[in-house]
């Protein structure tokens, strides 16, 4: 009897486990997913308890970023691994040349080059790229190429080459080509575009000189040194007695004296022996002052550049500054305040083409260049002759031209012609060191 009771109880228990009659044999998709989903991959319950294995988690099977982070612990190491794991190693082909080191990035790479190389793949030699024809060799001022070695930089005598071997720092209180009043207020000099131009604020054209005869305006000029100025040779074409000529530095407004002016007499006038009166070829003159001027915030020389620097670098700069007190309009009144204008330099071919179609334009030679606006809105004018055409480069201004000739003030379709100073740099330097006495001299260019 007892065994039968036990069997009956067992049967009831099994029926209870099966559930009520009519229960469905299959479960829903959501329930099945809940049963089958595994939070972590492992071959056994014990493996879930083991520390993460790179071989097991990511090499044998595809792993997620979260799983990789559990393995590496460090976010930085995880990121480095994941870039290669998910995208492939962009450095595998060794793209960096000349000993460069490759760093893999997502779908890209970066090469860290050795000191003498540059470029995306370190393919460019700096010694080959750093030549004076390429952006002046990155030099602040003067650049010189050397066969077999990289270029070297140097500076004007008023400056010192810095340890970086490219920068030039002033070594005197008033170096040439700098504008003290602008630097002291730490602002940019106005870049206005003498006809249609702007007043040059006091002190912002500190190299501007003015030649006067018997107290009247004769020509403009430019200070190169404490004792020397440059102007146009044609300014003396009709002067019988040059002893009446004075030079004024620090002048700004003809209608008033403010105490910053310095007046000097002229003791020497030196012209090229090939200059012919009434012609404009070789239109340049060097004047010696009877005693040096004193450099101040309002009297500073303009830098006379090296010839190669002027021809290869400065000549490529489109806009330069011209200044003077010339007539504001053709046959009009002379300006009382110093005026300045930014003029574009014209291509030599355009200049020659213009001269070909103009009966008034002189024959353009290699000793000249043209600048100005063909619409006639802005131009140098009579009275500006001899004034500076100054070009700015890396914080310093240089003398690139001397105002020589123009067809009236801002005549439509006409341009200004300037003496190309680079043709006379050697001549100027040579005679600034001369021991000539008082007088007018015509000296050979060679």
UniProtKB/Swiss-Prot annotation:
Coiled-coil residue windows: none
Glycosylated position list: 93, 186, 244
Induction of expression: Expression in the liver and plasma oscillates in a circadian manner.
Cysteine-cysteine disulfides: 58-63, 91-102, 96-111, 113-122, 132-143, 139-153, 155-168, 176-303, 200-205, 219-235, 351-370, 381-409
Localization per Swiss-Prot or TrEMBL: Secreted
Catalytic residues in the record: 234, 283, 385
Binding sites annotated in the UniProt record for substrate: 379
Residues making up the propeptide: 25-41
Posttranslational modification: The vitamin K-dependent, enzymatic carboxylation of some glutamate residues allows the modified protein to bind calcium.
Keyword terms of this UniProt record: Blood coagulation, Calcium, Cleavage on pair of basic residues, Disulfide bond, EGF-like domain, Gamma-carboxyglutamic acid, Glycoprotein, Hemostasis, Hydrolase, Hydroxylation, Protease, Repeat, Secreted, Serine protease, Signal, Zymogen
EC primary class: hydrolase
Signal sequence, renumbered to the chain: 1-24
Primary location class: secreted
EC id: 3.4.21.21
Domain EGF-like: 87-123, 128-169
Residues of the Peptidase S1 domain: 194-433
UniProt catalytic activity: Selective cleavage of Arg-|-Ile bond in factor X to form factor Xa
GO biological process per UniProt: animal organ regeneration; blood coagulation; circadian rhythm; positive regulation of blood coagulation; positive regulation of leukocyte chemotaxis; positive regulation of platelet-derived growth factor receptor signaling pathway; positive regulation of positive chemotaxis; positive regulation of TOR signaling
Residues bearing PTM (3R)-3-hydroxyaspartate: 104
InterPro entries: Coagulation_fac-like_Gla_dom, EGF-like_Ca-bd_dom, EGF-like_dom, EGF-type_Asp/Asn_hydroxyl_site, EGF_Ca-bd_CS, GLA-like_dom_SF, GLA_domain, Pept_S1A_FX
Family: Belongs to the peptidase S1 family.
Protein name: Coagulation factor VII
Organism: Mus musculus
């Amino acid at each position: 009897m007892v065994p039968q009771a036990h069997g009956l109880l067992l049967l009831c228990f099994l029926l209870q486990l099966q559930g009520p009659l009519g229960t469905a044999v299959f479960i829903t998709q959501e329930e099945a997913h809940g049963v089958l989903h595994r939070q972590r991959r492992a071959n056994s319950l014990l493996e879930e308890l083991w520390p993460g294995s790179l071989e097991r988690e990511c090499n044998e099977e595809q792993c997620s970023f979260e799983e990789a982070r559990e393995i590496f612990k460090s976010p930085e190491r995880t990121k480095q691994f994941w870039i290669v794991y998910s995208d492939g190693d962009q450095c595998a082909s060794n793209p960096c040349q000349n000993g460069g080191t490759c760093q893999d990035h997502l779908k890209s790479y970066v090469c860290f080059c050795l000191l003498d190389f540059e470029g995306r793949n370190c393919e460019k030699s700096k010694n080959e790229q750093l030549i004076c024809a390429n952006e002046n060799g990155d030099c602040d001022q003067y650049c010189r190429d050397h066969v077999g070695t990289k270029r070297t930089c140097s500076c004007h005598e008023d400056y010192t080459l810095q340890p970086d071997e490219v920068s030039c720092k002033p070594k005197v209180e008033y170096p040439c080509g700098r504008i003290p009043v602008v630097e002291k207020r730490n602002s940019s000099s106005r870049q206005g575009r003498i006809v249609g131009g702007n007043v040059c604020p006091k002190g912002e054209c500190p190299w501007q000189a003015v030649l006067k005869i018997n107290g009247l305006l004769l020509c403009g000029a430019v200070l190169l040194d404490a004792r020397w100025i440059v102007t146009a040779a044609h300014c003396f074409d009709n002067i019988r007695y040059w002893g009446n000529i004075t030079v004024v530095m620090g002048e700004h407004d003809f209608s008033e004296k403010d105490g910053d002016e310095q007046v000097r007499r002229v003791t020497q006038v030196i012209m090229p022996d090939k200059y012919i009166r009434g012609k404009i070829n070789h239109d340049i003159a060097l004047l010696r002052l009877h005693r040096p001027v004193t450099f101040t915030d309002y009297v500073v020389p303009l830098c006379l550049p090296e010839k190669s620097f002027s021809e290869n670098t400065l000549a490529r700069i489109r806009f330069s500054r011209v200044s003077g007190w010339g007539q504001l309009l053709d046959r009009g009144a002379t300006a009382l305040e110093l005026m300045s204008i930014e003029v574009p330099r014209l291509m030599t071919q355009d200049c020659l083409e213009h001269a070909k179609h103009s009966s008034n334009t002189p024959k353009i030679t290699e000793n000249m260049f043209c600048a100005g606006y063909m619409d006639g809105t802005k131009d140098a004018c009579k009275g500006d002759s001899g004034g500076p055409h100054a070009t700015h480069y890396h914080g310093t201004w240089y003398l690139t031209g001397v105002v020589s000739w123009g067809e009236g003030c801002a005549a439509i379709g006409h341009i200004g012609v300037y003496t190309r100073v680079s043709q006379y740099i050697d001549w100027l330097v040579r005679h600034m060191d001369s021991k000539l006495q008082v007088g007018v001299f015509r000296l050979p260019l060679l």
